[in-house]
Curated annotation (Swiss-Prot):
Name of the molecule in the record: Caspase recruitment domain-containing protein 18
Highest taxon, organism lineage: Eukaryota
Function recorded in the entry: Inhibits generation of IL-1-beta by interacting with caspase-1 and preventing its association with RIP2. Down-regulates the release of IL1B.
Record note on quaternary structure: Interacts with pro-CASP1. Interacts with CARD8.
Gene Ontology, cellular component aspect: protein-containing complex
Residues spanning the membrane: none
One annotated GO biological process: proteolysis
CDD domains assigned to the protein according to its UniProt record, in alphabetical order: CARD_CASP1-like
Residue ranges of every copy of the CARD domain listed in the record: 1-90
Keywords linked to the UniProt accession: Protease inhibitor, Thiol protease inhibitor
Amino acid sequence: MADQLLRKKRRIFIHSVGAGTINALLDCLLEDEVISQEDMNKVRDENDTVMDKARVLIDLVTGKGPKSCCKFIKHLCEEDPQLASKMGLH
């Protein structure tokens, strides 16, 4: 369910998220062992624009299944409540 919701809201996330939120999400997801250090480095270092980082991050998380997506949504609500609200995640 959570993975389907994120897929539907993918475009809003990509176009609206800021660099600070992406970095905070990466830290939280690494701490929760949703992503690996390698995944984190891939998002941060292999993408030039914030939109590219956002695209890779949301695709990475949705590919890991509903539990990972729930953790992503929880952290997004904490780190950027405005964006979470815009995405209809509250």
